[in-house]
Amino acid sequence: MRILLTNDDGIHAEGLAVLERIARKLSDDVWVVAPETDQSGLAHSLTLSEPLRLRQIDARHFALRGTPTDCVIMGVRHVLPGAPDLVLSGVNSGANMADDVTYSGTVAGAMEGTLLGVRAIALSQEYEYAGDRRIVPWETAEAHAPELIGRLMEAGWPEGVLLNLNFPNCAPEEVKGVRVTAQGKLSHDARLDERRDGRGFPYFWLHFGRGKAPVADDSDIAAIRSGCISVTPLHLDLTAHKVRAELGAALGVEA
């Protein structure tokens, strides 16, 4: 099985090293094409205004000055000697759940693999802060992902669907199981922090806040909060089919 790895935290990210160890438990045909720098929050963006610069690190490791989407395209269309059987994106430092999947470069890497006709899985590891220090239990994803991915590949899933895996913030032995979940919903509060530079000109920092919101029992959020691994199938068809039918009826047109 040929596996292509990417991420959005960059070629030197610890999560990518974890992902490679996971992949090597599944196959010895593993390739890495990852961003040269951190591309977090760039979602499914492409680099169109400048050329893509590819740097070969060794025989099967490449860094690209581009987004996770660029990396998957580069891997599938140029770097690999043949099409991969699986694209793995991650392991992200921090969960990618609920509405946050729309911002996630990690999820976008898997999305691009899916668009290119390759089975694809995004992996993210929840963490906590100790003071101002981020504590990420990478060993949890590393311990549980290989077997889970193997089982998922054996089970299979339809074309046009990617799998989004999130691992809870706990030790490997404390994981309480696996849940197949729905994408949850978070309360959304984007705000701007305006400041002034040395010449008095304004600049801004973007901040995201989270208020309290009901959490559905079958959601990715609920699974992670309960100490379970969340497996969420996401499809590329964004059509709201029920609303489409309702609007067609309201307008008296075919839908």
Swiss-Prot record:
Binding annotation for a divalent metal cation: D8, D9, S40, N92
Keyword Nucleotide-binding part of the UniProt annotation: yes
InterPro entries: SurE, SurE-like_Pase/nucleotidase, SurE-like_sf
Alphabetical UniProt keywords: Cytoplasm, Hydrolase, Metal-binding, Nucleotide-binding
Cofactor binding: number and manner: Binds 1 divalent metal cation per subunit.
Pfam family, one: SurE
Main location: cytoplasm
Cofactor(s) annotated in UniProt: a divalent metal cation
E.C. numbers: 3.1.3.5
Catalytic reaction annotation: a ribonucleoside 5'-phosphate + H2O = a ribonucleoside + phosphate
Location in the cell: Cytoplasm
Family: Belongs to the SurE nucleotidase family.
UniProt protein name: 5'-nucleotidase SurE
Native species: Brucella canis (strain ATCC 23365 / NCTC 10854 / RM-666)
